[in-house]
C-alpha cells in the first residue's frame, strides 16, 4: 500500500468527513486545524476566529486506488468555491476554503483544477478557495472525530440546513 496525505478546509469539518470517508482507497479521515498562529489550538480558540486556523480534514489515501484529482472533485462538489465568508450556514474565517498541498505535484493539480473550474462556472466573483502549503496539522478533539457516525441525527440536520442554504443561492 502506498499511502499519501491530503488536506482540505471546506467549512465545518463535520460536513467534510463523510464525503471522503465512504470510498474504497480512503484509509482515514481526521478532523483538525491548520494554518493558524497558535500551537495546539482548541476548538474554542479556532471557533472564535482569532487563531488563524481553518477547520481542516486530513485524508490518508491509497494512491493505487484513489487519485488526488478524485479528491479534488469530491472537495469541490461539497463546497461553494466563491464564498469568501465561510461555507453555507457556517460563517467566519475558520470556515473559509483552502487546499493545503504537501508537495509540488498536489499544488500543480490543484492549480490546474481551479483554472478549469474558472472556465466552467459562470460567475462574476473570483474563486475564493486558496491553495496554500500545508503546515502543522492539529487533530481536533475526539468528539469531533467521525461526527457523522457518532451523531447521525445532528449530522443529518446540519446537512439539511446546508442544502437549504445551497438552494437559496
Swiss-Prot record:
Keywords, alphabetical: Oxidoreductase
GO CC annotations on file: cytoplasm
SS bonds (residue pairs): none
Protein EC: 1.8.4.11
Example of a GO biological process term: protein modification process
Active-site residues per Swiss-Prot or TrEMBL entry: 12
UniProt entry tagged with the keyword Ligase: no
Domain of life, per lineage: Bacteria
Gene3D superfamilies tied to this protein: Peptide methionine sulphoxide reductase MsrA
Record field: catalytic activity: L-methionyl-[protein] + [thioredoxin]-disulfide + H2O = L-methionyl-(S)-S-oxide-[protein] + [thioredoxin]-dithiol; [thioredoxin]-disulfide + L-methionine + H2O = L-methionine (S)-S-oxide + [thioredoxin]-dithiol
Gene Ontology terms for molecular function: L-methionine-(S)-S-oxide reductase activity; peptide-methionine (S)-S-oxide reductase activity
Statement: the UniProt record of this protein carries the keyword Hydrolase: no
Database matches in NCBIfam families: msrA
Family note: Belongs to the MsrA Met sulfoxide reductase family.
PANTHER family named in the record: PEPTIDE METHIONINE SULFOXIDE REDUCTASE, PEPTIDE METHIONINE SULFOXIDE REDUCTASE MSRA 2
Function statement: Has an important function as a repair enzyme for proteins that have been inactivated by oxidation. Catalyzes the reversible oxidation-reduction of methionine sulfoxide in proteins to methionine.
Protein name: Peptide methionine sulfoxide reductase MsrA 1
Source organism: Staphylococcus aureus (strain NCTC 8325 / PS 47)
Amino acid at each position: 500500500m502506498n499511502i499519501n496525505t491530503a488536506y482540505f478546509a471546506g467549512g465545518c469539518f463535520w460536513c467534510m468527513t463523510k464525503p471522503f470517508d465512504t470510498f474504497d482507497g480512503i484509509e482515514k479521515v481526521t478532523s483538525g486545524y491548520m494554518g493558524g498562529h497558535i500551537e495546539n489550538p482548541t476548538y474554542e480558540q479556532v471557533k472564535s476566529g482569532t487563531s488563524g486556523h481553518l477547520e481542516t480534514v486530513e485524508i490518508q489515501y491509497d494512491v493505487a486506488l484513489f487519485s488526488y484529482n478524485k479528491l479534488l472533485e469530491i472537495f469541490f462538489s461539497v463546497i461553494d468555491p466563491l464564498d469568501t465568508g465561510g461555507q453555507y450556514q457556517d460563517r467566519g474565517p475558520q470556515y473559509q476554503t483552502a487546499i493545503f498541498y504537501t508537495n509540488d505535484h498536489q499544488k500543480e493539480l490543484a492549480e490546474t483544477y481551479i483554472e478549469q473550474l474558472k472556465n466552467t462556472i459562470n460567475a462574476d466573483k473570483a474563486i475564493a478557495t486558496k491553495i496554500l502549503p500545508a503546515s502543522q496539522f492539529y487533530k481536533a478533539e475526539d468528539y469531533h472525530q467521525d461526527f457523522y457516525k457518532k451523531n447521525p441525527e445532528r449530522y443529518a440536520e446540519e446537512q439539511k440546513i446546508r442544502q437549504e442554504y445551497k438552494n437559496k443561492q
